[in-house]
């Protein structure tokens, strides 16, 4: 049930009947304050100006055509021409009943699309670090939301699995006579990588061998391909452990690394030349883009092939977008890549559009995000100033949560405590990130994220268990409750019901904008409204059975909404805390 969409259409029709153009925008929004009703239509100002009318005069005319019978109990004009809409308690009660009768809580399915989501993208032969966290969990929240709404989602883990580093690694492994890569842990590979890089920089003979190995690997030599595959396998096996710990839906089947696009690159360069988009410049192949200017104010040159014949990330990203449209048949492509890559992506996509590889009707969206900072406001590092490995971060989260949970539940059995600590610890790390607007940097703070107050995972998980405890005390099952009517008489009942029915609107925003913090804010607000409702509207000690059962149904929908909302974020719920 999308009340905002329903009201928008009703107000738009009334505006047209009052003389507004057919493309008028009613600007129906959820009201910020309860005294302004549940929704507010703010579109009169812009339209009245075009019509040469006073906004309030237009609002009065719109009201004469606005039929909200059975939806609103009151509609009023406020200020210069805002229209405040107060939902009818009977309408709220009816739709709470409908939401409870639906497995999807009354959430409709939009027109199905094929949506490719590019996220996580770790590098082969390196352990995942905290820099991979945001892309991985924000991207996964978007995937979960889009899948719940019924879209066909293709996860694309754009792994860094190609390039000169593989020549280096294979050459160094060979030198050490440790070619059986299958027996190595990833931590060994990280050490190998550092040693290989050192030799590559200092030993010209070794560097030359590494460069030759890259050529052999790229030409398809089976020995080198097999070594490369082993390196990829070790890395992705280790990464899968991290994905599973994070409760992220990525699997090995979702890997679409840089190597996938490599065979396409010569053809793309040739095609861009044939189309007159790419030209030779100082031995390299370059596309000059009018949309981007260099320091001299001239069109910026984007290199797609170096003079030594090598390709660049831009070339791969052009091939990648082309593949996602032509082969995966994407209707929409979302990229969860940090904000520092924005210009690079915009340049690649400008070339993609000019070449006609992806039509304008298929959005390519950079859902960029900021950095994770320490308490000092600088990039999050270890005490020694090194990169924090993601596995180490999750270990610490689990240890801190274990202490916290044991303190609150000294008699809890060990296996139950471990399960609860895992849900709280991993949930806390994820929720702390997801609850912040992804476009901004955020401060990583253990104390804040593990607090049982405020917009945190422990608070939300506790709020869910609190609602469940009402049912345990009520000793009533869902079947018994199903036949009971919902009756809304108190203001707090109406406020809770209206917020519950805004779940679909929240999902729609997250799906459109890729902003899971909107869901976090909604769930936190919902938990707060339930708390106020629980305090002021007695449930178990209600004046009669009808009111008791009606309030239990509001509690039931609250629990289901919290659980489903947290699930779209990849946050685990627990039955008891």
UniProtKB/Swiss-Prot annotation:
The cellular location(s) given in this protein's UniProt record come to:
Cytoplasm
Q: Which gene encodes it?
A: argS
Q: Does the keyword Mitochondrion apply?
A: no
One Gene Ontology cellular component term attached to this UniProt record is: cytoplasm
Q: Which NCBIfam families match?
A: argS
Q: Which Pfam families match?
A: Arg_tRNA_synt_N (PF03485), DALR_1 (PF05746), tRNA-synt_1d (PF00750)
Q: What is this protein called?
A: Arginine--tRNA ligase
Where does this chain carry the motif 'HIGH' region? 122-132
| Family annotation (CDD domains) | Anticodon_Ia_Arg, ArgRS_core
Q: What reaction does this enzyme carry out catalytically?
A: tRNA(Arg) + L-arginine + ATP = L-arginyl-tRNA(Arg) + AMP + diphosphate
InterPro entries annotated for this entry?
aa-tRNA-synth_I_CS, Arg-tRNA-ligase, Arg-tRNA-synth_N, Arg-tRNA-synth_N_sf, ArgRS_core, DALR_anticod-bd, Rossmann-like_a/b/a_fold, tRNAsynth_Ia_anticodon-bd
Q: Which UniProt keywords apply?
A: Aminoacyl-tRNA synthetase, ATP-binding, Cytoplasm, Ligase, Nucleotide-binding, Protein biosynthesis
Family stated for the protein in its record? Belongs to the class-I aminoacyl-tRNA synthetase family.
Q: Which PANTHER family does UniProt cross-reference here?
A: ARGININE--TRNA LIGASE, CYTOPLASMIC (PTHR11956:SF5), ARGINYL-TRNA SYNTHETASE (PTHR11956)
Main location as per UniProt: cytoplasm
